[in-house]
Structures are given as C-alpha cells and as structure tokens.
From Swiss-Prot:
Organism in which the protein naturally occurs: Vibrio parahaemolyticus serotype O3:K6 (strain RIMD 2210633)
Highest rank taxon of the organism: Bacteria
GO MF term (any one): ATP hydrolysis activity
Gene expressing this chain: pstB2
PROSITE patterns: ABC_TRANSPORTER_1, ABC_TRANSPORTER_2, PSTB
Protein name as it appears in the record: Phosphate import ATP-binding protein PstB 2
Compartments, record wording: Cell inner membrane
Quaternary structure and interacting proteins, as annotated: The complex is composed of two ATP-binding proteins (PstB), two transmembrane proteins (PstC and PstA) and a solute-binding protein (PstS).
GO annotations of cellular component type: plasma membrane
C-alpha cells in the first residue's frame, strides 16, 4: 500500500527543469531514502510532498502527486497538508523558547488550551522522540541548552505532536556527531511503525542502514528505485552502480 503515488511529475524553476517525469510510489509506514549527488533533485522532490516549493517564486509543477489517493496539488488546504506531512530539516531549528513550549507551540496554535491535554501530548511526543528521559526534569529550560542531537530529537517531537501521517527528513543527521546520528537512526526504526518516513541523505551507508526502499536521482531524473538491498547489491542501471560504488558523487 502506498502513501504517495507520484506520476509524470515535472518541476521547473523558471526555465530550468529540476525534476523530469518522476514516477515513484512511496509505501506506507516504511523508510524511503532519496539519494544522489548534490543538485540531483532529491530535496526538491522531498519538498513537493508537502508543497514547500510553493514558497519559491517562479515554480511550476505538472503531473500528479497523490497522498492516500488525493491529488495534493488540487483544491486542498495546504496548511492542513503540512500538518499531515511534517518536516525535519538539516540543521536543528528549535524555537527560542523552553523545551516544553517547543512541543506545545503547535498545539496552542491550533487553539488547544487545556493544560492537562498539552502536558500529555508533550510527554507522549518527547517519549516518541526518545528524549523524555533526558529532559523530563528540565522541561522549562531553554531549548538552546540542548546538544545538537537533542535539539534534532526535540524538532522530531515537535513534529509528531501534531499527529502527522508522514515525516519528511532532509539530511537530518548531517550536522550531528556519530553518536547523535546513531540515536536518530534508532529512532527512525521506531517511528516507521506509526509514520511514513521519507529521508534525503548524502550518506549511502545511512541509506543502506535505515531505509526499506531507496530511490536514486541524477540530474533531475529518477534513475532507479527498488528495495534498498537490491539498489546496493544488484542495481539494474549502470549509473546507479557507479554511484553506490563511489565512482562519482
């Protein structure tokens, strides 16, 4: 069963075509990794999934991108889409407020005022991000006092507090040390039990470790997608073979 179905998707920045006839199913409650060299289109595609590219002037998109069978570029509420499809960015970006308020912020923005409800969601979200035990005694402390890895897990907690269906991750560990990276990767294994995860990564080793499916992009084209084990052990396209072998990057 697929969470997203992408069919003949083209994206232009003005006259420059950044994505070329992309056809890609993204299965539900699995980790799909998007890999390829810089500028290949993987982050551009990721941002199509919650319409973040709408914020860029001159963008034109054609083709079909459906979530649960509904065209997300049709007549839908984009704010609701971005709640259902949360996003975690490359650099941890906690809000300049307490740990507690970082997670509670989105709930308050939705009009939820009941303290007990907010307390429960904050704890559940921090537990879901494997952060609760590390911060439960300092929830009122400023989020900037956390380590980089903790800040990134706080951003994940902030995302899952909104009860999304999908979590997009754009190189979520590239700014983290190996220990923090390992914790995020362990967390993703747990998160996929409840969420569909799509991750952009420059690390082929990471894609191999954490993903169920992998899609390889090159110069705006989707070269190949398959089970991750197949992509890395028996790719069908010579360009994929060259990339996973490290012949270019």
């Amino acid at each position: 069963m697929n969470k997203f179905d992408i069919e003949n998707l083209d994206l232009f920045y003005g006259e420059n075509q950044a994505l070329k006839s992309i056809n890609l199913p993204i299965p539900v409650r699995q980790v799909t990794a998007l890999i390829g060299p810089s500028g290949c289109g993987k982050s551009t595609l990721l941002r199509c999934l919650n319409r973040m590219n709408d914020l860029i002037e001159g963008v034109k998109i054609t083709g079909k991108l459906a979530m649960d069978g509904e065209d997300i570029y049709g007549n839908i509420d984009v704010a609701d889409l971005r709640i259902k499809v949360g996003m975690v960015f490359q650099k941890p970006n906690p809000f300049p407020m307490s740990i507690y308020e970082n997670v509670a912020y989105g709930l308050r923005a939705q009009g939820i005022k009941d303290k007990k409800t907010i307390d429960e969601v904050v704890e559940r979200s921090l537990r879901g991000a494997a952060l609760w035990d590390e911060v439960k005694d300092r929830l009122k402390s400023h989020a900037f006092g956390l380590s980089g890895g903790q800040q990134q897990r706080l951003c994940i907690a902030r995302t899952i507090a909104m009860e999304p269906d999908v979590i997009l991750m754009d190189e979520p560990t590239s700014a983290l040390d190996p220990i923090a990276t390992h914790k995020i990767e362990e967390l993703m294994e747990e998160l996929k039990k409840n969420y569909t995860i799509v991750i952009v990564t420059h690390s082929m080793q990471q894609a191999r470790r954490i993903s169920d499916r992998t899609a390889f992009f090159l110069m705006g084209e989707l070269v190949e997608h398959n089970d991750t084990q197949v992509i890395f052990s028996n790719p069908q396209d010579d360009r994929t073979q060259g990339y996973v072998n490290g012949d270019f990057g």
